[in-house]
């Protein structure tokens, strides 16, 4: 079923992180000799590089390691905020990686790019799911799947690139619902793993170290997690406190970190101040309408 979904992809470019999901896709498409691209920050520590190189060697597929400078990343931040229309630091940090990968594909005159989107939601890959009690896990997986969204689609549309995600094929989505939660999250040896059924199914087809590699967010793998320390070091503490106070007084927005402040200032210059809605469904930090969610997609506040 997943092979069929991969084979139906028209693009011949893979966004490769060297994680489980993109490696499974590379395994199914290896006979095509697809082009793979990995985004790695030059100036920060990135964990994906070795794994991407291992996948490239294992499946004999060409790999471009696109090493991006801090200047490239700062430019990508502004473009990503412009497209996603939020200043959620975690979402921005992760999705500038995909912005840079999709931008690279466009520069190579590719019409599309293939991603591993969806596997973490459908097969319980997120770290916060791993330690959920058994009686809560199934409901939590269902909740995650009901609100899943993929900013890569917005980025691709903005850049004129088709984003194809084999795990989000309707047949796979429906099939994933029939898999018991104890096959999605389970112990293997002494460790508890999300996406257990995917790992077990493909452990003989892909490198073992990748099959059982712990979930690594894009921001860690590409190195953009280093942005937090960058902003902490370049923004003066006193200036931060002064700006934080002014923004809270004038805009009614509570800024939590220096990184968030940088993103908010870009967002505000582009889209202005968020209007406060009537009722109890507004985020207490930024006034965005969150309905019944504990997570604010606009500013990244959690729990609220």
What role is predicted for each listed range?
Residues 91-106:
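A conserved donor-nucleotide-binding helix/loop in the catalytic core
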Residues 49-84, 115-117, 122, 171:
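A conserved beta-strand->alpha-helix junction
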Residues 1-14, 104-110, 266, 270-278:
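Phosphate/ATP-binding catalytic cores across multiple sugar-kinase/actin-like superfamilies
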Residues 113, 118-134, 145-251, 275-279, ...:
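Mid-to-C-terminal catalytic subdomains of enzymes
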Residues 12-62:
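ATP-dependent adenylation/pyrophosphate-handling site
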Residues 253-285:
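Short, charged low-complexity linear segments at domain edges
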Residues 25-26, 75, 123-126:
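Short glycine-/acidic-enriched loop or helix-start segments at secondary-structure transitions
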Residues 25, 48, 93-97, 164, ...:
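Hydrophobic (often cysteine-bearing) scaffold residues that line and stabilize catalytic clefts
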């Amino acid at each position: 079923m997943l092979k069929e979904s991969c084979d139906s992809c028209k693009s011949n470019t893979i966004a490769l992180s060297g994680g489980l999901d993109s490696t499974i896709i590379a395994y199914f498409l290896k006979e095509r000799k697809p082009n793979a691209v990995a985004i790695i920050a030059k100036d920060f520590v990135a964990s994906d590089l070795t794994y991407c190189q291992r996948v490239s060697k294992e499946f004999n597929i060409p790999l471009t390691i696109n090493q991006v400078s801090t200047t490239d990343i700062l430019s990508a931040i502004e473009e990503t905020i412009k497209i996603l229309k939020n200043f959620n630091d975690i979402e921005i940090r992760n999705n500038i990686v995909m912005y840079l990968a999709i931008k690279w594909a466009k520069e190579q005159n590719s019409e599309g790019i293939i991603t591993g989107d969806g596997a973490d939601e459908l097969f319980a890959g997120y770290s916060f799911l791993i330690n959920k009690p058994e009686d809560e896990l199934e409901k939590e997986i269902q909740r995650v799947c009901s609100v899943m969204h993929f900013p890569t689609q917005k980025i691709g549309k903005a850049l004129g690139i088709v984003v194809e995600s084999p795990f989000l094929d309707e047949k796979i989505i429906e099939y994933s619902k029939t898999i018991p939660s104890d096959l999605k999250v389970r112990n293997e040896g002494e460790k508890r793993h999300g996406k257990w059924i995917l790992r077990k199914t493909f452990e003989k087809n892909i490198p073992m170290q990748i099959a059982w590699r712990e979930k690594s967010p894009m921001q860690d793998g590409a190195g953009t997690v280093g942005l937090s320390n960058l902003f902490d070091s370049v923004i003066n503490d006193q200036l931060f406190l002064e700006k934080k106070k002014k923004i809270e007084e004038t805009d009614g927005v509570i800024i939590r970190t220096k990184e968030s402040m940088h993103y908010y200032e870009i967002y505000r210059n582009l889209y202005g101040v968020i209007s406060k809605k009537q009722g109890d469904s507004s985020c207490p930090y930024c006034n965005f309408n969150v309905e019944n969610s504990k997570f604010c997609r606009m500013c990244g506040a959690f729990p609220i």
